[in-house]
A protein has these predicted regions:
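Glycine-rich phosphate/ribose-binding loops and adjacent secondary-structure elements
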Residues: 2-3, 168-238
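Non-catalytic, usually N-terminal nucleic-acid engagement modules in DNA/RNA processing proteins
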Residues: 1-169
Length: 238
């Protein structure tokens, strides 16, 4: 891999465009256009902790050809030294990575630690200010042990937060996560509602504990209920 290789930026009018180049049933091969180049899908996005880099992001790009990665905007926002550097120089310089950067918003931290200290609009604005390629709204995490009514409230609150998150993002591509816990009906409700809004990508939210518990039958039901109700012209992230 050429160590001097840099991504070729897409035209601004193409940002967020998803081209499906081949398909087999619900499976798709595509090209997703971003500010930092075109990425092919499906693809694996490594997760980078900005405080602990096991493999440097630059090495991922130079040596392994990784086109895109994920880092956490909430972690950056919470640590003043990272926050100041990201606001001054941008997230790409902060982690030394020229490719596509997607950021999470702190939703998973709310699942792990019980709460986050940042607001819905604030975290989207921060992601915009540090120059991410694909930002994520602050959705409400649905745990596998939650009741139907609890999960439905989480789905409804996420849908309520969505319009102001999109407005705050402006021209930045935004993830619209699909929640719904273990309930296919609520996954479908979330997918229909989020698909009707101007998101660029739809992550399937709340599935980490399900995969950790190896509940793959439940995972398959979640994916079926979600994908069958999502717009086919957008990528899905899981």
């Amino acid at each position: 891999m050429d160590p001097n290789r840099e991504p070729e930026p897409c035209r601004p009018q193409d940002w967020g465009k998803f081209e499906i180049t081949n398909r087999d049933g619900a499976a798709r091969i595509g090209k997703f256009h971003t500010r930092h180049g075109v990425v092919t899908t499906p693809m694996l996005l490594p997760v980078v902790n900005p405080n602990l880099r096991t493999i440097e992001p630059r090495e991922m790009w130079d040596k392994y050809g990784i086109q895109a990665l994920i880092t956490n905007s909430y972690v950056i926002w919470k640590h003043e030294n990272l926050k100041d550097s990201a606001l001054a120089d941008g997230v790409h310089k902060l982690i030394d990575y020229p490719g596509v950067i997607m950021t999470d918003s702190g939703t998973f931290q709310s699942y792990v630690y019980g709460d986050v200290e940042v607001g819905v609009e604030e975290i989207v604005q921060f992601q915009k200010d540090i120059g991410v390629d694909i930002a994520t709204m602050l959705d409400v995490f649905s745990r596998p042990d939650m009741t139907y009514s609890q999960v439905e409230r989480a789905v409804d609150e996420t849908l309520e937060r969505a319009p102001i998150s999109i407005e705050t993002a402006g021209g930045v591509m935004l993830n619209g996560p699909i929640q719904g816990g273990l309930f296919p009906k609520l996954r479908a409700k979330s997918a229909v509602g989020m698909s009707a809004l101007d998101f660029s990508v739809h992550p399937i939210g709340g599935i980490v504990p399900i995969m950790e518990q190896q509940k793959y039958r439940d995972l398959a039901k979640i994916m079926l209920a979600s994908k069958s109700n999502l717009s086919p012209n957008r990528p899905v992230h899981m």
